[in-house]
């Protein structure tokens, strides 16, 4: 596959989720997210702070953006959005829920900004910079309507239990790799979920130990002679307890990063892989359409040839006998059937040619999209793992510095 350059025209940060009260015409409260974006200058240099544009969008705005892009670019892998509701959270306005969604929405926009086609869309540019988004959204309401394609949905259901007869080696390999990647990312997700729970439990235990040490410190410093060895012991206990408190706080910070960002990155990657699989399924549907039309054309040609040669199927034999009893001219009826079949074959030939062109074109675009997905995936995993390593290095470096000072003072 040819090298495709990712888009690097936008730097985007989603932050500061805020609960807002709905007006009288709206239903209930909602959360807005601050989107800070700026265009990248030539030579991969960041533009100045004056070029930063700040807008506020709610989740339904993201949904509209996704729907329009999915409708306008059916051959592209449009990154998925996080689910509107998550069963784990009863309160969708809680800090934990909104902060995690905030990071996930940032991943969504960054993927769009990296896509060489989607990043050029007018709707994305308007979404990122327009201060009059509400008016723009209302103008779209009448034209957009329900963006779901009913014909495509019906086609998907009809082809759900069918498979492609001749799958290219490239797509066989793509399906195998995506399946393995999905499995591995899911395993890592579950593993780090357990890590977070374990670290939170350890941090809580360190906190309890700190309380016990504080009580012990108070006990040993209640004597009359504050300058005695017992008083010295109290000072050392206090110093040691400060180190334990620092360890507990730092461990909680590390767990918070893993829970709020790294695990979210993993789950977003799982959803992104699923979107890629959906595009491959759509490609397969185009291939199935072509194969079924080809089979139908072959059957029609065979039926026409059988009539020309004077042979027919068993059902045609009984039908011709019935027509003979009713006084229908067999030869005239045969010629009429042949004529209809010739017209049918001619129309089907055109349909098969068109279906072949559509299937080939969609396959070509799907291969490009898979390459784009691979590049974005590689970049994301590299960034995510690097940041994870940096947080662990920072944690252990802080612990080395803290306990080195404590050791000296003890």
Curated annotation (Swiss-Prot):
**Keyword Cytoplasm belongs to the record:** yes
**Membrane topology note:** Peripheral membrane protein
Q: Which InterPro entries match?
A: AH/BAR_dom_sf, PX_dom, PX_dom_sf
Q: Where in the cell is it found?
A: Cytoplasm, Cytosol; Preautophagosomal structure membrane; Endosome membrane
Q: In what residue span(s) does the PX domain sit?
A: 11-135
Molecular function (GO) terms for this protein are: phosphatidylinositol-3-phosphate binding
| Protein's recorded name | Sorting nexin-4
Q: Which gene encodes it?
A: SNX4
